[in-house]
Amino acid sequence: MDGLGEKKPWGKLSRLLGAETESSSELFLYKKEWTIGRKKACDLSFPGNKLVSGEHCKITVNEESGSVSLEDTSTNGTVINKLKVVKKQTYPLKNGDVIYVVYRKNEPEQNVAYLYKSLNQAEDSMQNPADTSGSEEADTQTLSSQDDQLSYEEPQPSTSTSSLFSTPTTSASEPACTLLYKSQASVPGVQLESGEKSGESLEGHSSTSDATAHEKGSLGPPKKRMRTEDLWTGNKNLVSASCSKGASDESKTPSMKPDKMEETLTCIICQELLHDCVSLQPCMHTFCAACYSGWMERSSLCPTCRCPVERICKNHILNNLVEAYLIQHPEKCRSEEDRCSMDARNKITQDMLQPKVRRSFSDEEGSSEDLLELSDVDSESSDISQPYTVCRQCPGYVRHNIQPPPYPPPSDTEASRTQGDAPSTSTNFPTATQEYVCPSHGSHVICTCCFQPMPDRRAEREHNSHVAPQQCTICLEPFCHMYWGCNRMGCFGCLAPFCELNLGDKCLDGVLNNNNYESDILKNYLASRGLTWKDMLNESLSAAQRGVFMLPDYRINGTTVLCYFCGLRNFRILTYQYRQNIPASELPVTVTSRPNCYWGRNCRTQVKAHHAMKFNHICEQTRFKN
């Protein structure tokens, strides 16, 4: 703060409501522009607070006029006197304004608030001493932390007080009503409604000197006493209105922190209990349907983890938990008007894909989005109708979505197949797939692997064998790989005939009941004979066809269409039987000389290397078997 000696400060920020009471909680503003944010380069930096944006806001002063303004540049929003500042817009700062860098309704201990004080105005008020002032010390001494929270230089004194005392202060021993009265009675220079200057202010009540009070009289002149009572009556109504909001608020003053269940069931966007909640895939974070309806128009990222959202689903379990919680805590239920408003803003009436973002929304610094509903900032005119599911075969898909055609020119190169548009598993059905065009608002099904929609032609396949399979025979889950090729990164081919499934090079790792030692024995056996897992699969399928090997489902054979997971599960069943039928003469002596484990293949300790090396687990359980 070397600049303090060179340039006179024009304002001061005093920390409010925070747990820290350090000397650095008071900051003098002397530069023309003062920045606040999480970056270390900011003048007021919060490097460890993820609720603060990299460049949250900035305070500027007009050196000619002396006017001070605040511009919000954050993603979470800046709040002044409980009113959210519109992003990229400036807000004029007045003496006594409370600036919330972080505002959490249900977690006031996380609030980061500062009281702005204009030093020029403070000097003006100190240059006009009261007629009955006892000493100059009373005019020039620094206000206490509670007195600094109030300023009544605006025409309506209730503006700043109502915005400040609705949240708990650092003093938990006195109720809000008492603090309000004390502050109004002790702050010098309180402006009255009739516009009296410092000569008719309440300065007489702020003096603690008995001699000064004796000179003035116990209650001051009758006119002053009448104006004081009017001021107290007006603010008492404000306090009564705020206290009537909840019957149990007074009893909860010592511990404002919500219980764990309430924290779990709270939406981070509106900071209220979840209402008709939805979950995002793949991250599974949960929000109110109405809150996320407004969010998804501005960003395709999750407000919590910044993960790209692929799908939005109703969360019925959490909805039931919220309903049960509200039965036990009816005072925390939303008002009927609030619920109707949220239902009207809800655009997620069914499970759906994340729609295309219509306007950009800054995702700076990866900070957590904590939107506030303190003011009606978002325009209601941005509402759009419920989007319906479309796929690459829907009419007009290419026209509305600027993407390359879904089917590249026929090519036998591997590069064209890696894109997933011409998979080798669907070469028998290229014409029927490529020529199909979805009817208007036709039925679609979502691929379990890539979460992308495709036409639902499963019923049509029962009558037309040229339609590519779209679901697994065992689990009946839909997959798109055989229809037009799955485009998900890392997909080996999520749907294919059992004999053509690509299980990957690591499919033999822990393939025998997660026993790595037994699996390594099998891998060494195959390598010594120049065999691969594919050769073993074909040989095992032939044995299953002859009835030598058994599978849990009689329908499974080499041509059965299976998904990757069902195929891998049945591959492990066949692999165990293949290993069981290897003659002992073809295995090393160190393998065949081990005694059998009592628990056999059902042993839960075989995953430990020492136990797996000591006992053979390619056998059936012989002890404690029911």
Curated annotation (Swiss-Prot):
| Coiled coil feature spans | none
Principal localization reads: nucleus
The record's domain comment reads:
The PBZ-type zinc finger (also named CYR) mediates non-covalent poly(ADP-ribose)-binding. Poly(ADP-ribose)-binding is dependent on the presence of zinc and is required for its function in antephase checkpoint.
Molecular-function annotations in GO: nucleotide binding; ubiquitin-protein transferase activity; zinc ion binding
- Biased-composition ranges, Basic and acidic residues, are 194-203
Query: A GO CC term?
Result: nucleus
- Where do the segments described as Disordered lie? 123-170, 188-229, 351-387, 402-428
Q: Which family does it belong to?
A: Belongs to the CHFR family.
Biased composition annotated in UniProt, kind: Acidic residues: 363-381
User: Which organism is this protein's natural source?
Assistant: Xenopus tropicalis
Protein name as catalogued? E3 ubiquitin-protein ligase CHFR
Q: Which reaction does it catalyse?
A: S-ubiquitinyl-[E2 ubiquitin-conjugating enzyme]-L-cysteine + [acceptor protein]-L-lysine = [E2 ubiquitin-conjugating enzyme]-L-cysteine + N(6)-ubiquitinyl-[acceptor protein]-L-lysine
